[in-house]
Design a protein with these regions (language model features):
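Aromatic-anchored transmembrane helix interface
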Residues: 63, 90-103, 113-141, 150-156, ...
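A membrane-periplasm/extracellular boundary helix in multi-pass inner-membrane enzymes
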Residues: 164, 168, 258-300, 316-319
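N-terminal signal-anchor transmembrane segment
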Residues: 2-80, 100-109, 166, 401-403
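Long extracytoplasmic/lumenal interhelical loops at the membrane interface
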Residues: 298-362
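Alpha-helical transmembrane segments of multi-pass inner-membrane proteins
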Residues: 149-176, 195-260
Length: 464
């Protein structure tokens, strides 16, 4: 029997006990979502293992659709209008790049009567790029700023699995020796170490190093420990992948970010940097077209590893002119395959120059569209949506990737595309500017007069 005190105790009937373990944001839901997303991302990343990649190509990347499916399922049962309102503008910005490439390619196809096979190849690349972008958005929708941590864990698991699966083919001792030799000689890869050159994931670890070295939170002891742990892991996998052009690029942009992070920068600075990048690209294309880059690097004894030969072979396929409209998205893959079949090249390697590749494919107008969205409009957006530190993070990540665009094929890598969008968007979630409060403004002097009269009347007749 209850005592009098228990009977007289006021009960709070406003608190509702969840009827199920799966109420919104329950620990069980969050654990299941976390495990599911990590499994999907790690499984998709495992597709970068060379035996799997050689057998089925980029098909395992479609496993990442599971993350999008989880986000849709979660939204179906527990819709969060606030998060949807926060994410629709960045999503629209991200997808505008894909839409621009698609519609401009349609113009080129109609004008040049392109083959159906070329259109299919272009659309498939746009679809995979869209999957990467939407996966990043879905992960941020589910976990906000924690999405960066889960993404890091996933790619670390994938890279570790690839390292372990590659050992039986070479033996444990030979694998360790090959890896040590590669690290000591700064890239003299052979055997096991060559198997670990996972191009896409390696470049992604460079982006993560930039984030954890400069921008990751470090207020509490737990945050400091996590930051140090993930930074060490990313550095390890980054060095194991050993992309020599990426190492100085990471160091350079870490220093730039550290220099600018605490400084007050005028609002026009970052968009101006983007405009300067576009002008640099045009100058770079001119120098590539007329062999200036090749002669300069050869004069210093730098081995271009056949890049100058590929770049010169591309000259008949484009014009350095504002009237050049391009050949269509993914056209370069067509001519590379043609050169390989004709015996002009030993391996069907791409240009190793994504700036040239984009210009050949989408022409001068399309190139300006592609570069303006990424280098000018997106920094402007992040300044308005969040703050300058978010803008600095985006441009630091993009600047690092831009260095690789000049000598590699990273502009449309699946994981690089995903990381570039995910890191900035997740970081912006905690730095997003609150909406401006709405202040009543009178439409006319007559309205002000009526308001004043009403106030006088209330003060005259009010008993208070």
């Amino acid at each position: 029997m209850r005592t009098l005190d228990q009977i007289l105790t006021k009960k709070d009937y406003s608190r509702k006990t969840p009827a199920s373990l799966f109420y919104k944001d329950s620990p069980l839901w969050q654990k299941l979502l976390t495990i599911g997303c990590v499994v999907f991302l790690a499984g998709a990343g495992l597709g970068e293992w060379k035996p799997i990649n050689s057998a089925v190509g980029g098909l395992p990347k479609a496993i990442s659709l599971g993350v999008i499916g989880l986000a849709m399922l979660y939204t179906l049962f527990y819709p969060d209008e606030k998060r949807l309102r926060e994410l629709w503008k960045p999503t629209l910005l991200y997808m505008s790049l894909m839409a621009a490439l698609f519609f401009w390619s349609m113009v080129i196809w109609i004008e040049s009567f392109a083959a159906v096979s070329s259109m299919i190849r272009s659309c498939s690349k746009i679809v995979f790029q869209s999957i990467a972008i939407l996966t990043a958005v879905a992960l941020v929708y589910l976990f906000r700023e924690k999405a960066i941590e889960l993404f890091t864990i996933s790619i670390c698991i994938a890279n570790t699995a690839i390292m372990l699966l590659s050992i039986p083919g070479y033996g444990f001792a030979a694998s360790i020796q090959s890896l040590v030799t590669c690290l000591i000689t700064f890239g003299d890869a052979d055997g096991y170490a060559l198997q670990l050159e996972i191009h896409d994931l390696t470049f992604v670890f460079g982006q993560m190093i930039l984030y954890y070295a400069v921008f990751a939170p470090r207020t509490t002891r737990q945050e400091k420990r996590k930051r140090c742990l993930y930074l060490l892991l990313c550095c390890w996998f980054f060095l194991v992948g050993m992309k020599r052009i990426a190492i100085p690029a990471v160091v350079l942009f870490v220093l730039i970010a550290l220099l600018l992070r605490k400084r007050k920068i005028p609002g026009w600075f970052y968009p101006a940097v983007g405009v300067c990048c576009i002008l640099f690209f045009l100058a770079f294309l001119y120098c590539v077209r007329y062999g200036v880059i090749s002669r300069l690097l050869n004069s210093f004894g730098i081995d271009m590893m056949g890049r100058d030969y590929l770049w010169s072979m591309a000259n008949p396929y484009y014009e350095f002119s504002i009237t050049y409209i391009g050949r269509g998205f993914e056209y370069v893959d067509t001519i590379i395959a043609q050169w390989y079949n004709d015996g002009l090249i030993n391996q069907p390697y791409p240009f190793h120059n994504d700036i040239l590749k984009v210009f050949v494919e989408v022409g001068f107008p399309g190139f300006l569209l592609w570069s303006s969205i990424q280098y000018v409009l997106t920094p402007l957006f992040w300044q308005r949506y969040a703050d300058q530190e978010t803008t600095l993070l985006y441009l630091s990540e993009l600047g690092y990737m831009t260095v690789t665009y000049l000598t590699d094929n990273t502009a449309f890598y699946f994981w690089s595309t995903m990381a570039l969008r995910l890191v900035t968007l997740a970081y912006a979630m905690e730095r997003k500017k609150p909406p401006e409060p709405k202040v009543w403004m009178p439409d006319s002097r007559q309205e002000i007069g009526r308001a004043c009269v009403g106030k006088e009347c209330r003060s005259r007749w009010s008993p208070y």
